[in-house]
């Protein structure tokens, strides 16, 4: 399995902080050859302004195997993010840890030995965003889960409502007539 190394303050694999969008796109296409069985498949690339700051541009790069999110400041990559999908075909490592196949709690504990963390929740086990400023790494997950939640009656009541909602997917949601 291909290995992609995350280097704090440097980059992810061949994608380096400080690259222009053209340089980064070329490096990404080179990296893609290493993980993709269909390297001829087009990679979708788009850059757009998402804030009022004219110096900040967001780049999105995706194909069937991967999704990268890049923030450009003044034309240079200031942040490079890699999404979990690529972990199906490559091992993505930071400080030797497989970042998408290691429990979040273990990763957070390990990184806290190197740096202080800023978390969006008081309970670190239930946060969704973690920022380690000294090592220059941000971690994100859509929702948090920890086994201790299964002991919380309020959580279990909410989850029961979610499960009941899921039952609707036993039935079709659309029927189409074609001529």
Segments predicted by a language model, with ranges:
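Hydrophobic/aromatic-rich structural module bridging two neighboring secondary-structure elements via a short loop
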Residues: 50-73
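Non-cytosolic coordination micro-motifs
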Residues: 1-52, 79-179
């Amino acid at each position: 399995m291909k290995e992609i190394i995350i280097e704090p303050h440097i980059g992810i694999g061949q994608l380096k902080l400080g690259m222009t969008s053209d340089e980064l796109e070329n490096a990404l296409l080179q990296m893609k050859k290493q993980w993709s069985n269909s390297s001829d498949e087009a990679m979708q690339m788009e850059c757009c302004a998402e804030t009022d700051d004219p110096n900040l541009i967001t780049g999105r790069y995706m194909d069937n195997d991967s999704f990268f999110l890049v923030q450009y400041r003044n034309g240079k990559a200031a942040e490079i993010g890699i999404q979990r999908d690529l972990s199906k075909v490559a091992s993505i490592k930071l400080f030797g840890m497989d970042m998408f196949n290691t429990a979040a709690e273990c990763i957070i504990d390990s990184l806290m030995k190197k740096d202080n963390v800023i978390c969006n929740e008081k309970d670190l086990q239930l946060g969704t965003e973690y920022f380690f400023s000294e090592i220059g790494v941000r971690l994100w997950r859509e929702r948090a889960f920890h086994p201790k939640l299964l002991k919380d009656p309020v959580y279990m009541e909410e989850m029961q409502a979610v499960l009941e909602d899921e039952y609707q997917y036993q039935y079709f949601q659309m029927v189409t007539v074609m001529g």
